[in-house]
Amino acid sequence: MGQASSHSENDLFISHLKESLKVRRIRVRKKDLVSFFSFIFKTCPWFPQEGSIDSRVWGRVGDCLNDYYRVFGPETIPITTFNYYNLIRDVLTNQSDSPDIQRLCKEGHKILISHSRPPSRQAPVTITTSEKASSRPPSRAPSTCPSVAIDIGSHDTGQSSLYPNLATLTDPPIQSPHSRAHTPPQHLPLLANSKTLHNSGSQDDQLNPADQADLEEAAAQYNNPDWPQLTNTPALPPFRPPSYVSTAVPPVAVAAPVLHAPTSGVPGSPTAPNLPGVALAKPSGPIDETVSLLDGVKTLVTKLSDLALLPPAGVMAFPVTRSQGQVSSNTTGRASPHPDTHTIPEEEEADSGESDSEDDEEESSEPTEPTYTHSYKRLNLKTIEKIKTAVANYGPTAPFTVALVESLSERWLTPSDWFFLSRAALSGGDNILWKSEYEDISKQFAERTRVRPPPKDGPLKIPGASPYQNNDKQAQFPPGLLTQIQSAGLKAWKRLPQKGAATTSLAKIRQGPDESYSDFVSRLQETADRLFGSGESESSFVKHLAYENANPACQSAIRPFRQKELSTMSPLLWYCSAHAVGLAIGAALQNLAPAQLLEPRPAFAIIVTNPAIFQETAPKKIQPPTQLPTQPNAPQASLIKNLGPTTKCPRCKKGFHWASECRSRLDINGQPIIKQGNLEQGPAPGPHYRDELRGFTVHPPIPPANPCPPSNQPRRYVTDLWRATAGSAGLDLCTTTDTILTTQNSPLTLPVGIYGPLPPQTFGLILAEPALPSKGIQVLPGILDNDFEGEIHIILSTTKDLVTIPKGTRLAQIVILPLQQINSNFHKPYRGASAPGSSDVYWVQQISQQRPTLKLKLNGKLFSGILDTGADATVISYTHWPRNWPLTTVATHLRGIGQATNPQQSAQMLKWEDSEGNNGHITPYVLPNLPVNLWGRDILSQMKLVMCSPNDTVMTQMLSQGYLPGQGLGKNNQGITQPITITPKKDKTGLGFHQNLP
């Protein structure tokens, strides 16, 4: 019964303490308070025996905690001990007159009385010094239990003392705390409360409480040499003291919140801890002698302090502990807890009537956050103006703009500051994008940092949602939360689109003629990061484009090192950087004055002994003049005239010689010089013939050295091309520009710089070069009409991802064939320079409301459907499909007016047959919810159906071409010598189907 009553009193005291703290806007849990008092009972075993709780007794508890921290180290003390201590101290100190606090002290007094140990009534026993030493626990610090009597003036032990003789005093002798088991003298009663002493005795005969405490501790130290030293001597190694065991005190499970150091007292001072408030009985001697004794004790304490072996260590009286990491002192302006702040901010409670039993059943809870005092500074408008200017000039994601934002974010901006900065610096569209990205990243952070149970306000703090939309509340966020806000703001800012960034193809990014290679690679990598994401700027595809899209000068510098396995593009940048210096020197040398051109430029040097022999045998070279003209008015044109051309060769661009004398195989950029057109040795078109009248053979003229002239030369026509040999059937067509062919931009139309028309009574057939298919290039064949006058184009496609076609590459040939006129009927008088290709006449049939239907048999079963010339395959409705015919699901897509994913298809090939006996095989698709069956081109092509238009104009054209109604275009009615391979039946009327009304 007594234990149950004790537990009920404990619960009542803890409940009152929680209510007192809740009034101060502090939330604590019951199990934390129980753990805290359990540690207090372990550290201060005299506290339950004190029988009272007030500010004075609680101050002595703080002294004991400070001594325990100094001796055993911070690792032996729970992290929240000093915080809870400070909270309870403030409750006892600041509101001692409150009825609630008085009731709380009363409940605590009852608990301490119930846990206190009654004083022993055993007769006093004399213990010698040796017995004291043998009975003292070797590994336990002396107890400071306040329930013992202290003998001040005992000299029975015969010990020598530095103090004056106290035999004249009538006070009882002071005893060591180790003698607390002996019965105290009856003339010195034990007083559990100092208030009893003040009410029972005369005020003139009592000591000051401070002097009384000093006297008691000095006397106990004097009579007990093993009393803990009050000076800051080197402390013993820390050890874990044994738990307090008492049969009278039941074990209590306890724990508690976070506190700060008390403001009273100087840390590390040598003052002794306050002993329990044990009041002495009315002294029998004069008070002056007691005061002189007190002065002597203080003098002795001072001397003992001077004898310390080591200087006093600067140990804090009460260490400040918190859950957040320590903030360095050099981080000015960041979040740091105030040293005197020991309150916890009020958190929004979901249920104000939360019971204590719910607190006890919680397995884990969100740790209470301390209040953080920031040296918060609002955003400076000048800084925002700088960021706004950088965004307007360079874009929001430019390196300089991002550097400004990162520098500003080091101040740990709140969500309100980020929103204000986004509205002020970004445009309307970018502001909306930033907000959406910030909210998305905030949700991700909240999910990653979520604990169990999840915090009620975790997802609301990072985006600054209600009730944390106020900037003052946001400034109190802990450093860890502000770090997440900083990271979310920067990530959202860096995800904004670049200024003027258009969605362009990566293959279209080329290096300009005057652009540095590093700038070109930078643009290429930025586009690759924007299209493919970060980490793709060093991929093999980007490296390939860095070579293929570079200008010829950089390509010639990179080409020797292209085959090497390069992990990065840094070596390419080095090669092109050195090559750019050489190009700059060459460009500077091209702008030499005419006088500087007169300087000797020997092509080679030969040392000879006989100049006469050298003049006769040496090849004739253009020699520069040996000396400059002496006449100042002499014309320089005559001097330069004998020096050859004043500009570099247009063919190789390397030397000052004529293009006709150029024998270089590579140009200045290292590119091979490709001879355009056919070979130079080929004769003119047609065979040689002999003029019998004149008696000699006529030879064709020699073709020019460069059959593909530059673009600045006059137009070239088909008749200007040359054949390779007399038996060559085709004329080569070359590209006039450098081209990159990809699967994305193919088919691609390229001009060849050759114009029509063709020779009379001929037409051209465009065919591909035989070696192109092996390179992944496909040239689509075409027909070149006789009267086509525009520029000839060729149509290319590729089967590879990327193919480069240099300028001047031979891609196709024109085969000139004779044109045979059938009749004089034509649609237009001439072709002109319209688009390349054949100008066929299209027969158009007007579609009416009637649907052309056809009945066919599939495996003997009759089906009716609509002729659909736009459908690639036949589709049967699922309602018409027999249930016993097997189906299979195929991984394909059917697209038309609608779309079907993974449709069903016949598992076997079906045989179709029409009413005229024509048959074939198909594998139709089967779709649900299809109202009619569709006959696709897979059946129509096998039936060899043609569409006949009743248009009068079309019919006139067909009749002029030899068409006989009711008959096919036979060999006798068309005028051609070759027969038609397929002759339709002459008795076949129409298309073999009839048109039904819908």
Curated annotation (Swiss-Prot):
Catalysed reactions, as listed in the record: dUTP + H2O = dUMP + diphosphate + H(+)
The UniProt record lists the keyword Magnesium: yes
Active site residues per record: D868
Residue pairs linked by disulfide bridges in the UniProt entry: none
Compositional bias annotation for Acidic residues: 346-366
Alphabetical list of CDD domains matching this protein: HIV_retropepsin_like, trimeric_dUTPase
Record site feature (Cleavage), residues: Y163, P164, F318, P319, I585, G586
InterPro entries from the UniProt entry: Aspartic_peptidase_AS, B_retro_matrix, B_retro_matrix_sf, dUTPase-like, dUTPase-like_sf, dUTPase_trimeric, G_patch_dom, Gag_p24_C
Source domain of life: Viruses
Polar residues: bias regions: 117-132, 193-206, 323-334
Domain spans labelled G-patch: 950-996
Enzyme Commission numbers on file: 3.6.1.23, 3.4.23.-
Keyword annotations of the record: Aspartyl protease, Capsid protein, DNA-binding, Hydrolase, Lipoprotein, Magnesium, Myristate, Nucleotide metabolism, Protease, Viral matrix protein, Viral nucleoprotein, Virion
GO cellular component, one term: viral nucleocapsid
Free-text function comment from the UniProt entry: Matrix protein p10: Matrix protein.
PANTHER family linked to this entry: ENDOGENOUS RETROVIRUS GROUP K MEMBER 24 GAG POLYPROTEIN-RELATED, IGE-BINDING PROTEIN
Name recorded for this polypeptide: Gag-Pro polyprotein
Protein species of origin: Squirrel monkey retrovirus
